[in-house]
Amino acid sequence: MQTPATIKSYQDIKANIEKACQRIAPLWPLKHFVAVNPYVGLRDQPFWRADQTLRKITGKGLTMPRPYYEEQIANGRITQEDLDEALKEMHSNWSVTQLKQAMKQRSASRNVPFPVFADAMFADDRRDWPGFVVERISQYCAAYFDEGQATWSMPWRDDPMYQAWLKFMHFDKSPRMVGLRGIGEAAAALPAAAETAIALALKELSVPFDLIDDYLFAALLSIGGWAGWARYLRWQAELKGETDQSLRDLLAIRVCWDAILHKTCADIAVRKQWHLMLHTQQNRAIEKPSEHVDAILQTALEIGYQRSLIKSLKEASRPSNTVIERPVAQAAFCIDVRSEIIRRALETVAPGIQTLGFAGFFGVLMEYVPFGSNAPKGHLPVIFNPPYRVCEDLSHASEDETQRHAAKRQLRLRVATAWKSFKTSAVSTFTFVEATGLLYAPKLFGDSMGWTRTVPHPDERGLDSGTKQRLRPRLIASGNGKSSAKSTGIPETERAGVGEFILKNMGLTQTFARLILLAGHGSTTVNNPQGTGLDCGACAGQTGEASARIAVTLLNDPATRRGLEEKGLKIPKDTYFIAGLHDTTTDEVTIFDTEDLPTTHAKDLAQLRQWLADAGELTRLERATLLGTASQAPEVVTRDMRRRTRDWAEVRPEWALAGNAAFIAAPRQRTRGVDLEGRAFLHDYDWHKDAGFSTLELIMTAPMVVANWINMQYYGSMVDNLRFGSGNKVLHNVVGGSIGVLEGNGGDLRVGFALQSLHDGKRWIHEPVRLNVVIEAPQAEMESIISRHILVRELVDNGWLYLFQIDDDGSVYRRVCDKQWPRMT
């Protein structure tokens, strides 16, 4: 290989490296598997330009296969009117007739991914060299990043990733086993610095300068799962003001593999094939969006949904300016689309109740430390840093008793870990099964029949039922209360400020009911590595229980209420907040800490429980349509949904956020009584009460962005499951402890959602449409926020979501280019 002295424009290469790294979306670990926009690194490009970029790099863009759209036209989901509007939207000169004619013609040239050198080797002998390279890198990454799953850990994990790989390659004999010679020697000749190695690799491969960006992006996407994990490590470091070079090092490893294969390849034909591939890329033309048939059809699909949504909103009741009487109760749920159904059901069984929608962390920006643990869990949107750390504590216990119970849990967890290590160790493989196998027969039978849970719920491991019932968040601060290793709780002087933030942004500043429920949400499943993806995204992939309980504790705190009153927020003395958890698998709501309620509210609580039970039944019956039990009696539907929480063979315990398509920030009266089919994120917001529009700014910079991430995660998992989804859930194997899953026993780390989360085996349940954001607020204020926040501006201006304004009179306007807001008819 050439020496560093021959490298020119090193700073330019460094910029190329950074650009490629920024294109990769982070992949959160299984312990808090939050949805993320897989195209987040392309948001600086207009949506259909990003489609062109992806078709050039991966061979697959942002649309479904043609037959999908043909089916939507055939069943009436896409109408003639939708097609006509889509042609105008895409500035196409075609008529609908010409479009339909073009649909019959398949593209003459298939979209070919941007090549890596292993592709040239594959083209020569048809052996899966790209898969071999990915397999070797994936095995290395699994060992390097392992979080305790491996019995024997890699000896070089303390070294930077690239330097550790150089040592690993000295011992890796797998290339020789498949007929590759000189690999170890070529790896040993690589420079020690990752950036220098990348520059040398590009020289070795003769990648033209104008293709460097594309090549580096393609190289990272070829190992995109582990690239996502490395990007996550970098994301976490950046939140702390630090840096992490794992992604850069992974890029170096990937391009160095290509350079090594090129250097050791003696076949002139393969090298010629490689240069021909690069030349083809330099002269490649991609269809314009206006001539891209599937882009027009995708736009028509989205227009069809918008037409239905806007019609529903226009027909809904308009918000009233009259003073609302005191509700019989108030219930705040997360904005999650699954809450839309149960809110609508609760309002049906109890017309006098008021429901609200707010992000499920309920405004408490914290990390939460489970009882007996030293490892905090984030309970806030992942785009924020937690200012507070709150510990789970044993109620009504002395310090000595608390320490005894904590030590007992830690001991149980250590014993369980040791026992599992013994059961899975090489020495006990046969003796353990022969000696104790029959003792597991009753549990195996019960688990197989779905009568028992295969394992305890993660939050209950090491706890007996009595201790579990006594656990609750500890509000009292130690230290300064800020998020650090030694300080916990929320200082009394800051509680009123936190309380004001909660109530103001929830839109709950007057007309308080006697009983106010804050209901977080979570899912209950077994044998589901990606189970936290069903929990609350606003709580960083945890259930909303802790967030709801700490918010309730704070708002019931006398000191907090005194401080709130000084700020002009007077909560009536007979108003009490209570925490709950909506199980989205069964639609049952558990209420916590009821012993703290005064006896004067016993009837209120009993009535609320009954309403929640009735609403849960209505919700289950509605969801049964998509679960195949719609024809069954209510009690049968309930039993089936409870079974899903225990059945280790159930690949579709619930549909989670499949179908999500809209985000609505408006007074509830705007959507009350409207069947939004569980497809809309609902955030209560009344701009008339938002002095300074700080709440509007929060909505557009946090919940709206998170909803876009969720929406695009589903979108990417559906339109390109191979790269941005996780394949077949049945084949998932956990790697690295809790890092992620492989499909089968090898290949790249998988990202996104499994096919079973999108398809019921016969038809697609999710519909890939970009998020439709509808906000009831002045256009000028929204424009001001868009101009101040580049992230929001990129999402709106580049078409990664649709933004609509709904006026006081119910008129709807769509934000288009040049800051124009044409009225929707």
Curated annotation (Swiss-Prot):
InterPro entries from the UniProt entry: DabA
Keyword vocabulary terms for this entry: Cell inner membrane, Cell membrane, Membrane, Metal-binding, Transport, Zinc
Membrane-spanning intervals of the chain: none
Domain of life (superkingdom): Bacteria
Cofactor: Zn(2+)
Disulfide pattern: none
Keyword Kinase: no
Membrane topology, from the record: Peripheral membrane protein
Compartments, record wording: Cell inner membrane
GO cellular component, one term: plasma membrane
UniProt binding sites for Zn(2+): 334, 336, 521, 536
Function description: Part of an energy-coupled inorganic carbon pump.
Membership in a protein family: Belongs to the inorganic carbon transporter (TC 9.A.2) DabA family.
Subunit architecture: Forms a complex with DabB.
Name of the featured protein: Probable inorganic carbon transporter subunit DabA
Organism from which the protein derives: Acidithiobacillus ferrooxidans (strain ATCC 53993 / BNL-5-31)
Gene: dabA
